[in-house]
Amino acid sequence: MARSILHMLTPLKHMSPFDVNMAIDAGFETLIPYTGVDLTDVVSLTQDSIFSRAPQDGVRTGIFIGGKNAELALDMVDRAKKAFVPPFVNHVFADPAGSFTTGAAMVAEVNRALKARFSTDLKGKRIVIFGGAGVVAYVAAVIGALEGAQTVLVGHDGEERVSKIAFTMKWRFGIDVGAVDGTLPEARRAAITDADVILSAGPAGVSILTAEDLESAPKLLVASDVNAVPPAGIAGIDVNAVDVPLPTGKGVGIGALAVGNVKYQTQCRMFRKMLEAQEPLCLDFRDAYKLAVEIAG
């Protein structure tokens, strides 16, 4: 059997050691990082990877796409797919900054909690997402909308930037995502007034919602925070929290390590799917979400 090779592409200066470790621990034998990769480089790199091996060894060859930009990663996936010349085809898996698997795990954990605690699901729920301009928020918003929720991005620097992001989501996925201002405490409280679910995907170590702020969310069922660095992004959610009652007594909280556990397993199993598949796979956050739901239970 041919050796398993993973070509790891990133537009950044360095490939993430996190992703390198995950791929090796999942079983890939040879990893080659390519840094500073531009969108225009993807076709030539992809075709070099496919034409240097026999067609039957395409399933032993993978292209991983990293970086920190969800839309650029998706565009790179599209370029790689278009560069294939059947039967010369490889696996492709995108997970920029771990956001595809983190966002998938976050929404999967919320879905699990909604079912376990409230006998409901994401459909029709209003999901308000802080850190709205970030990659994890992007993925969570798209997954939520695709699952039938009403997702809203909150911009820490105003409404304009998140509105543009929401517009590109509609263009790319055909979904409607809301956008609101979250610059001041009163704006953040107004944003969560009708929230069934609150997600915090803001910067590490930054408090976004206080216990007092949560009083403005009388309908709140589940809140999740992926910030693992004190202070918590959402007050009262410990990093290890799994369906822990929130300080207001309204709803339950899910912490960063609970989400991280599902994220870790999801990313590991995505790599293993590539190694075990008999046909080439193209994997993104939608595939990650299906797997994360299975893992979360």
Swiss-Prot record:
Enzyme class: oxidoreductase
Pathway: One-carbon metabolism; formaldehyde degradation; formate from formaldehyde (H(4)MPT route): step 2/5
InterPro entries: Aminoacid_DH-like_N_sf (IPR046346), Methyl-teptahyd_DH_N (IPR015259), Methyl-teptahyd_DH_N_sf (IPR037089), NAD(P)-bd_dom_sf (IPR036291), NAD-bd_H4MPT_DH (IPR035015)
Disulphide linkage map: none
Compartments where found: Cytoplasm
One of the protein's GO biological processes: one-carbon metabolic process
pH-activity profile: Optimum pH is 6.0.
Primary subcellular site in the record, as a coarse category: cytoplasm
NAD keyword on record: yes
Enzyme Commission number: 1.5.1.-
Superkingdom of this protein's organism: Bacteria
GO cellular component: cytoplasm
Catalytic activity: 5,10-methylenetetrahydromethanopterin + NAD(+) = 5,10-methenyl-5,6,7,8-tetrahydromethanopterin + NADH; 5,10-methylenetetrahydromethanopterin + NADP(+) = 5,10-methenyl-5,6,7,8-tetrahydromethanopterin + NADPH
Catalytic temperature dependence: Optimum temperature is 35-40 degrees Celsius.
SUPFAM superfamilies from the UniProt entry: Aminoacid dehydrogenase-like, N-terminal domain (SSF53223), NAD(P)-binding Rossmann-fold domains (SSF51735)
Keywords: Cytoplasm, NAD, NADP, One-carbon metabolism, Oxidoreductase
Gene Ontology molecular-function annotations: oxidoreductase activity
Family membership: To M.extorquens MtdA.
Assembly and oligomerization: Homohexamer.
Summary of the function given for this chain in its UniProt record: Catalyzes the dehydrogenation of methylene-H(4)MPT.
Protein name: NAD(P)-dependent methylenetetrahydromethanopterin dehydrogenase
Source organism: Methylorubrum extorquens (strain ATCC 14718 / DSM 1338 / JCM 2805 / NCIMB 9133 / AM1) (Methylobacterium extorquens)
